A protein has these predicted regions:
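Active-site SXXK
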Residues: 53, 69-95, 119, 162-166, ...
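Active-site Gly/Thr loop motif
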Residues: 194-197, 248-309
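Short, charged, amphipathic alpha-helices and their helix-cap/turn boundaries
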Residues: 54-58, 120-158, 176-197
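N-terminal secretory signal peptides and thylakoid transit peptides that target proteins
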Residues: 1-14
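Active-site-proximal alpha-helical segments within enzyme catalytic domains
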Residues: 158-166, 210-232, 298-313
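Active-site helix/loop module of the DD-peptidase/beta-lactamase fold
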Residues: 88-124, 171-210
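C-terminal segment of N-terminal export signals and the immediately downstream linker at the start
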Residues: 1, 18-34, 42
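A short, well-structured edge-of-sheet supersecondary motif
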Residues: 35-64, 300-303, 307-312
Length: 335
């Protein structure tokens, strides 16, 4: 082949490659256009679909890739990452009693039986009074309303307590004592989940139950680490066992993990703060789907078997009604 023929052939191949890439991008955008439109029409701000770490679709109705949005109770997805980081650093185990850290509980015959695992699962029996104070002192003094391990309660008390447990363990180990700063510098920064903003209680503790602000890409990276059970770039940076437990239900509630809602059938009536149709019989959610859910339709969906992480953020925590079942049906239709 002479030089001219070679150059013409190379140019043709380059043109084909470029047009193939453009076609693939166009098809990907078109594939999820209906889901993106559904989100945007309901005050959506961001929409992101990631499969096996590869972005399949990304759309912003407001802001951009680095814009942080308040995710409300979707913040709870960071609690299992905090727990898994502490376990990986050998600062705690899931089966140790809470009383090993909160010493005042040791003398209580019921509270002394509550393990970290039971606390994180929401089955400790501890919950704040509806119109009462929600500070640390109140949380520590709470008495279980039910026998630990028997009933689930969708309440912020376990998050307040676990933040204090983390603070005490980090202080004892001479590590960064602030749980949010520890998690951010140790785990979130390496995976690209920054910048992230935290709200705090009147005691100064970071709130892991509500109030974080993060970008769509950052939240997706956190979800990807959970989906991969703590492995990042071939390194185990957070405990696989702890993150595996975070995506399993308990005897008390099969639809609740550690800060995550799980697809499946419950054995009791719904008594949850979050509004969702995820568990309707018509829902297309796969059996292994996990979801972090904030007010206003702030959502992080994880589907491990499909390798999927999906983020949907709204402009406010009071946005229009949101249907998980309808949104997921649009996603799965286009996969």
């Amino acid at each position: 082949m002479d030089r001219r023929a070679f150059l013409l052939s190379a140019a043709a191949c380059s043109a084909v490659s470029a047009s193939t890439a453009q076609l693939a991008l166009a098809q990907s955008t078109q594939r999820f256009a209906t889901a993106a439109s559904y989100s945007a029409q309901r005050d959506g701000a961001s929409f992101l679909v990631v499969r096996h770490g590869v972005v399949l679709a990304e759309h912003y109705s407001a802001g951009g890739a680095d814009t942080r949005w308040a995710i409300g109770m979707g913040t709870r997805a960071f609690m299992p990452l905090l727990a898994a980081s502490l376990v990986e650093d050998r600062l705690m185990t899931l089966d140790e009693p809470v009383a090993a850290t909160l010493g005042d509980w040791g003398a209580d015959p019921i509270k002394s039986t509550i393990s970290i695992r039971v606390l994180l699962s929401g089955a400790s029996g501890l919950s704040f009074e509806a119109n009462g104070p929600r500070d640390l002192a109140t949380a520590i003094a709470l008495q279980p309303h039910q026998a630990p391990g028997t009933e689930f309660s969708d309440d912020s008390a376990p998050y307040v307590l676990f933040s204090e447990i983390a603070r005490r363990k980090l202080t004892t180990a001479n590590r960064e004592p602030d749980p949010a700063r520890y998690l951010t510098s140790r785990t979130l920064l390496p995976i690209g989940c920054v910048p992230i903003g935290w709200t705090r209680t009147s005691d100064g503790l970071p709130r892991f139950d509500d109030g974080a602000a993060v970008s769509a890409r950052g939240w997706a990276q956190a979800g990807e680490l959970i989906r991969r059970q703590g492995v990042w770039r071939a390194q185990q940076i957070a405990s696989a066992d702890a993150l595996g437990e975070a995506m399993r239900g308990s005897f008390a509630e099969s639809r609740a993990g550690f800060g995550l809602w799980l697809s499946g059938r419950g054995r009791a009536r719904d008594n949850f703060a979050i509004e969702t149709d995820l568990w309707r019989t018509s829902s297309p959610a796969p059996i292994d789907l996990a979801m972090a859910a904030g007010q206003g339709g702030q959502r992080l969906y994880l589907a491990p078997a499909d390798g999927l992480v999906i983020v949907r953020q709204a402009r406010s925590l009071t946005s229009a009604a949101w249907s998980d079942a309808q949104f997921l049906s649009l996603i799965w239709r286009d996969l």
